[in-house]
Amino acid sequence: MEQNADMEPDRQVNQRPPRFRARGAGVRGRGRVRRSAFSRGQRRPIIRVDDLQLPDPLYVMQALQRDHTLEMPRGQVDFSWIEAEERRVGPTDEWYFEAVKTYKAKPGDDLQTIIKNYAKISLECGAVYEINSKIRVTGACYIIGNCAVLRPNLPAGEAMFEVLNVDFIPSIGFMERIVFSNVIFDCRTTATVVCCISERNTLFHNCVFSGPHMLCLDLRAGAEVRGCHFVGAVCALRSKGLYSIRVKNSIFEKCAFGVVTGSKASISHCMFKDCTCSIMLGGQGTIAHSQFIVTTSAEAPMNLQLCTCEGNGSHVVPLGNIHFASHREASWPTFYANTLVRVRLYMGRRRGVFHPKQSTLSMCVIAAPRGVVQRIYLFGVYDATCAIMQLGEAGNAASERLCTCGFRHSTPSLRATYVTDTRIDRELNSQDTAEFFSSDEDNF
């Protein structure tokens, strides 16, 4: 600091009077550009690759174009400015998530207007936000919940959030889809509401859905749900259309319907506890590294009698705890390394062979119609206490049940028959082999 004192004679150092000191011979400067050398409104110079003098043993730096520059990071800007700039010059890869300013929303603010103007909003930690009207999201939206509570005050069946595919979403890195993170959806009243109806690809990260929600998530354009917790909901997640969904690291507890989807689904590292129907899969999918546990059959919602319909109600069958609906063209889902305890698995008519490899079926029942039980392959499966049953019609007996479509149907009663010829003959196949070995165990 004393070496540059001749450049700033009026500056005081440690409250001492200024003094003038000449730079001695052979004393170099500090080698950095002082900020005062540029005007206040002038931008910092662009650092180009040629100026860095990086080592280039492979001679690849010469092939870089002049527009490949390293620019110093800029400050945050408003989302509205980025949106207007993209409308003017078109999409670019210049903006990223960290460059967008975050708006601090407070309880009582108009969330619909704030989301439209700022897109990236942050809620107060632990605050309670009363939702008195439906919030329509038409463009970009990124909500940082900070464990804030969203409590609805809406009529029965009304949605808290409705994501519409109306406005375009600017090309901002890591903000390409709708995001809800660390939000608690709490429903304490008797009025059942829907948390979110989405017609865009949406991400729900580490959210909690607590209370008697009629439907937590109605996903119509694909979504990803990870690290979420669903408690006491009538239906936790429902997907329609041809879009696929992905659910991982989530917990479903005491829900009448867990995941109901007619399209492709990927479910991994999830836990389903005391759900009347944990999964109803109508299309192809993958279920891996998940747990399905039933602890009681007398308490709600396990005492409910449910069903599912096919062909607009023309064919109705009872609903199992894990239900694979019949499909003419779809194959059986990939079922790998899952744990089932006291679970009833229903299998409709599909193509191929069902092989629950490396899965544990403890005190479970696999129920399937005639002609399907012969397609169950139990090689490499822990099936000591698992029963396989073939279902058939039991006359004209029927009962009315609640269906996955939301209506009630007359469901025929079925007759079950034990089947044992699908098991592996352990007198000929030893268990002291590589049958129960996995390549993933080499890492432990």
Curated annotation (Swiss-Prot):
Pfam family, one: Adeno_E1B_55K
InterPro entries cross-referenced by the UniProt entry: Adeno_E1B_55kDa (IPR002612), Pectin_lyase_fold/virulence (IPR011050)
A biological-process GO annotation: symbiont-mediated perturbation of host apoptosis
Modified residues annotated as Phosphoserine in this record: 438-439
Recorded GO CC terms: host cell cytoplasm; host cell nucleus
Coarse class of the protein's main subcellular location: host cell
Superkingdom: Viruses
Keyword line: Early protein, Host cytoplasm, Host nucleus, Host-virus interaction, Modulation of host cell apoptosis by virus, Phosphoprotein
Localization, UniProt: Host nucleus; Host cytoplasm
GO MF, one example: ubiquitin-like ligase-substrate adaptor activity
Residue segments, region Disordered: 1-35
Family: Belongs to the adenoviridae E1B 55 kDa protein family.
Free-text domain note: Contains a PML interaction motif that allows the subnuclear PML localization.
Assembly description: Interacts with host PML-4 and PML-5; this interaction promotes efficient subnuclear targeting of E1B-55K to PML nuclear bodies. Interacts with E4-ORF3 protein. Interacts with E4-ORF6 protein.
Known function: Plays a major role to prevent cellular inhibition of viral genome replication. Assembles an SCF-like E3 ubiquitin ligase complex based on the cellular proteins ELOB, ELOC, CUL5 and RBX1, in cooperation with viral E4orf6. This viral RING-type ligase ubiquitinates cellular substrates and targets them to proteasomal degradation: TP53/p53, LIG4, MRE11-RAD50-NBS1 (MRN) complex, ITGA3, DAXX and BLM. E1B-55K probably acts as the substrate-specific adapter of the SCF-like E3 ubiquitin ligase complex.
Protein name per the record: E1B 55 kDa protein
Organism of provenance: Canine adenovirus serotype 2 (strain Toronto A 26-61) (CAdV-2)
